[in-house]
Amino acid sequence: MRVDNNPKIDTLINQLDLGDHISIFRQFFSRESSLYIEGDQELHYRYIKALDAIEFKAPPKVSDFTNIKFHLKKQGVLQFEQIFEIVKVVRYFRYFQNRELEGIIGEWMNKFLIEPKFLEVERYFTHEGKFDENLDETLFHLGSRVKEHKANINESLKRLTSSQKLSPYLIDSQVHLINDEECLLVRGGFNHVLKGAMVGRSSSGGFYVSPDVILKTKEQIRYINEEREAIFYSYAKEFSSKLCELLPFINFIDKEFTKFDNYQARVLFAKSRDLKLIKSKKDSKIVLEGFIHPALHNAKPTSVNFSKNILMITGVNAGGKTMLLKSILSAAFMAKYIIPMKLNEHKSHIGGFKQVLAIIDDPQNVKNDISTFAGRMQEFSKIFECRDARSEERR
């Protein structure tokens, strides 16, 4: 999955004071993704608007499938956590299928045909992603034995805390879990009445001790857990083998989920902040009505008509000229990436631009005798040079 790693885009976002807005927007994604949606923008916008017309729950956080698919291609064994990442995506698409939606969203969801072989894997995972040991008789009995042994350990420790010989050395009567070891917290000199291994020290100088009396029971638990792990691994091998055969299906849902994630993030972000979804048109005209830059608080809406070749902005110092320029460029940038913004979507019109370049920062340099005007002319010159160079390459 391609993610944004473009210093120029990051610089532009900072220049336009969109950093916080984009950061909040990214939080709505289920997994890390590019801001730009590859492909037919008109078609993407249709899906986004169709999704915007319905209420739905946000997808769960999902990991990237790159390593998962790589392991399956090499016929490797996936961990249960990796398998559950696939299960989460399938269950989320099933949630949409069960709603029996009409229109393009319903048609899209009907494309997800879940193989019976996948259901054989999915049924072993609970809603929280835990392996359901109740479905395996051996695992169920082993789990019951572990619970019994742990109960015996607790009983043994309780008897120790009630011991009159040990009582003078006990700092408290609780059972502490240190490094997965059940321990008692005792004072120095405990070795006269208690045999055990010291696991750690408390901040008050006490000793965390795991008594020898529970050592045999803990060893039995370790043996049982090793047996359980062997069974878990056999299941992981079996599941991975089945998923390997379903790799085309996994590739498909991975690609479609990335697309859906881009759509839902925009829709839910817009709904959460009462923002509008607007995409760039196929011309170069910019008409903003009721636009508010996301970095401004309690701001008055901006309206501007930039339908001619040149727009002249004048005003006194600290009169908002730079912020107006940032607003125009921000609107163009957000429309290009279909990022929700605050404006009157019915009266606004934002053209499409291959690139958005901002010459905003004050380039004045006293040492090199460069004024603000001269510095900005240099920036314009660099842009024109790049454009001319690309024109020469096309020839």
What does each of the following model-derived ranges do?
Residues 56-134, 144, 161-241:
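A conserved P-loop NTPase coupling/switch region
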Residues 39, 43-46, 61-64, 79-85, ...:
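Helical mechanochemical/support elements of P-loop NTPase systems and associated helical scaffolds
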Residues 65-68, 210, 260, 288, ...:
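Residue-level signature of catalytic and energy-coupling elements of molecular machines
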Residues 1-134, 138, 249, 253-267, ...:
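Conserved amphipathic alpha-helical "coupling/scaffold" segments
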Residues 50, 135-139, 202-204, 236-245, ...:
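Short hinge/gating elements
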Residues 273, 281-395:
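ATPase nucleotide-binding head domains, primarily ABC-like/P-loop NTPase cores
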Residues 230-275:
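Charged, surface-exposed helical/loop "interaction arms" that form contiguous linear patches used
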Residues 163-178, 267-290, 346:
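Long, charged, glycine-rich C-terminal linkers/tails
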